[in-house]
From Swiss-Prot:
Its main location: cytoplasm. This is Glutamate-1-semialdehyde 2,1-aminomutase. Its cofactor is pyridoxal 5'-phosphate. It comes from Francisella tularensis subsp. mediasiatica (strain FSC147). NCBIfam families: hemL, PRK00062.1. It is an enzyme of class 5 (isomerase). The gene is hemL. Homodimer.
Length: 431
């Protein structure tokens, strides 16, 4: 009789009570061909510990928020102090003001900000606001860019550059997504064609400035600046979805690196220090349309709750310290350089890249350009699954999808990075 692990037993039990046994699909490990996910017992620093007491070097960091590492002592201390004063008030609190001021200080393109509870709420609200501000209905998103699970975003590209979006999840009415247009990332021709056809109907373009849900694809040939220009030419708004990249690739987000000013920005992950939070902000004249200042309705029972705000304030204080992003970026660069050198040593078709505390792994030669969602689909996804399984079995916890970026924290040590490189080198040698 097979001895099952505690994770296997828990997963079987979870499936009786939770659809698919998880509360977010990627966590089931199905996309990487695994029979069961690892159930986590606790986390500290750069490590996860599962219910079978296996220890993992964690390169997911709760999908991005844990830039300081798990259970940072300073963040824990302020949360514990706040808990004694209440978990949620359903009323304004000083912490909301303090976190808003800090975000605006670090991201000057944001003049006012509204807090919500998730990245999905942030992007959904930003789209509603853009439509109200422009008095237009259509939006442009990019194939492969993920902006949460709101109906208007669950759209795949139809055939041809001018195709209207089609739902890619049951339960999403075609009438809901008929105003969602889908273009190809890094392809200005597809954008220009949409504006030519729907010139006075497009409220906004929403884009991940670095496509972290296509592993990690950078904008090419001034792509973001060109999006800014075409929006200006057509009186449309430009929305940067920096839920992933905000305070992760740089202190001022991707917009500070590429020096492109969006009208609206969505945030999440890092700004909550590990607590559930999202935000959208931008030009004051646009944000003043949000209720109660204006007519665009948005609300939330737990929005701006003092626990999340407190964790966010302390996290942003710590990452604002001089040299933080230099050190974080050096860690990511060491990992990426080591992986690339290991692959090159064994002529293994692989390359990695990074920016700030975010990195991407591509199972194809570095001579092959991966600039679009279609390009990513041509990489060796089967080999990624094998790599994932090997690394997991040897104590390295990577994102369980070839389409997801990885994250490093300030808590990762040189030894953690060197162990990761050594394991990858062995895999490259054997495959």
């Amino acid at each position: 009789m097979e001895n099952k692990s505690n994770s296997q037993i828990l997963f079987a039990e979870a499936q009786q009570y939770i659809p698919g046994g998880v509360n977010s699909p990627v966590r089931a490990f199905k996309s990487v061909g695994q029979e069961f996910p690892r159930f986590i017992k606790f986390a500290k620093g750069a490590y996860l510990y599962d219910v079978d007491w296996n220890k993992y070097i964690d390169y997911i960091g709760s999908w991005g928020p844990m830039i300081l590492g798990h259970c940072d002592d300073d963040v824990l201390e302020v949360i514990q102090c706040q808990v004694k004063n209440g978990l949620s008030y359903g009323a304004p609190c000083k912490q909301e003001v303090d976190l808003a001021k800090k975000i605006i200080e670090l991201m000057p393109n944001i003049e006012q900000v509204r807090f919500v509870n998730s990245g999905t709420e942030a992007t959904m609200s930003a789209i509603r606001l853009a439509r109200a501000y422009t008095c237009r209905n259509k939006i442009i998103k990019f194939e492969g860019c993920y902006h949460g699970h709101a109906d208007e975003f669950l759209v795949a590209a139809g055939s041809g550059a001018l195709s209207l979006g089609q739902p890619n999840s049951p339960g999403v009415p075609e009438d809901v997504v008929k105003d969602t247009l889908v273009a190809s990332f890094n392809d200005m021709e597809s954008i220009q064609a949409l504006f030519e056809k729907y010139k006075d109907e497009i409220a906004c373009i929403i884009v991940e400035p670095i496509a972290g849900n296509m592993n990690m694809i950078f904008p090419q040939d001034d792509f973001l600046a060109k999006l800014r220009a075409i929006c200006d030419q057509n009186s449309s708004l430009l929305i940067f979805d920096e839920v992933m990249t905000g305070f992760r690739v740089a202190l001022g987000g991707a917009q500070s690196i590429y020096n492109v000013k969006p009208d609206l920005t969505t945030l999440g992950k890092v700004i909550g220090g590990g607590m559930p939070v999202g935000a959208f902000g931008g030009r004051k004249e646009i944000m003043q349309k949000v209720s109660p200042a204006g007519p665009v309705y948005q609300a939330g029972t737990l929005s701006g709750n003092p626990i999340a705000m407190t964790a966010g304030i302390k996290t942003l204080e710590k990452i604002s310290q001089l040299g933080f992003f230099d050190e974080l970026g050096a860690k990511a660069q060491k990992l990426v350089d080591g992986l690339n050198e290991a692959a090159k040593a064994y002529d293994f078709k692989f390359h990695a890249k990074c920016l700030g505390g975010m990195f991407g792994l591509f199972f194809c030669s570095d001579k092959i350009a991966v600039n679009t969602f279609v390009d990513l689909g041509k990489t060796n996804l089967k080999m990624f699954n094998q790599f994932f399984a090997y690394m997991l079995d040897n104590g390295v916890y990577l994102a369980p999808s070839a389409y997801e970026a990885g994250f490093i924290s300030i808590a990762h040590s040189d030894e953690d990075i060197e162990k990761t490189i050594c394991l990858a080198k062995k895999f490259f040698q054997e495959n």
